[in-house]
Amino acid sequence: MYGVCVTVPPADSPHRRRNALTGEWVTLSPQRTKRPWQGDEAEEIEATGVTYDPDCYLCPGNTRANGLVNPDYSGPWAFDNDFPALSDGIGANEIGPNEIGLGKASLDETRSAVTEGQAAVATERSLFCSEPVSGRCRVLCYSPDHSKTLTKMTESELSAVVQLWSDEVRQLRQQYRWVQVFENKGAMMGCSNPHPHGQIWAVDTLPTEAVKESMTQAAWFESQGRLLLDQYRADEEHSGERMVVATEHWSAVVPYWATWPFETLLLPRRH
């Protein structure tokens, strides 16, 4: 008979649940249903020609849903999400920048991480297994302009956004195992505010996809003595068939294994 999982996080707290069929984990954030919604249920909404909206929670000087007042920021600005999907108050697990994650794990370490799900199946033997997840969520406003998306920015404005991404990731990596920069585009994809912005999620657990990719790269390096993505970049550049652009520091390609029509993979020239 199956036992019962020891860890049972509060129903309204961030946690992850194990898929009993695959052994993989899914992160849930029940408390997110309480956040305010300024998006739309079906139609795409995008502010055009409006530089300031007095009702926008992200415009400079406006009051957010939690009562805090935004500063009169003049460039890209980041702050902790008022309604975060993750919290660092539960299951804190500080991981240094040289621990597992972001391509720095050894093969043995990565194998250990990827088998967390299988180990849970073997030890807990429960179909309803969950555990707390610790993390931090940041919101990044690209510009004080309510309608200026990334595609409308100047090169210097884009550079400022990229610099903010770098600064945020560098700081969060000192504590969390995984840091993800992303943007939900459009109301149907979960964008609750039309003011151009992105997000960063930092979490103390590794996503399944990241663990699998790290395992593959570690195994390739052990057998070939060369970084997998370094070899792949060189092969794509030689072929030229799927190249999008190549610069002094980066190459962008449509990956050979692309799932989506406009999928691109950025490959750095230094590591």
Question: Locations of the language-model features?
Answer:
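Active-site microenvironments that recognize anionic phosphate/pyrophosphate groups
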Residues: 1-195, 201-271
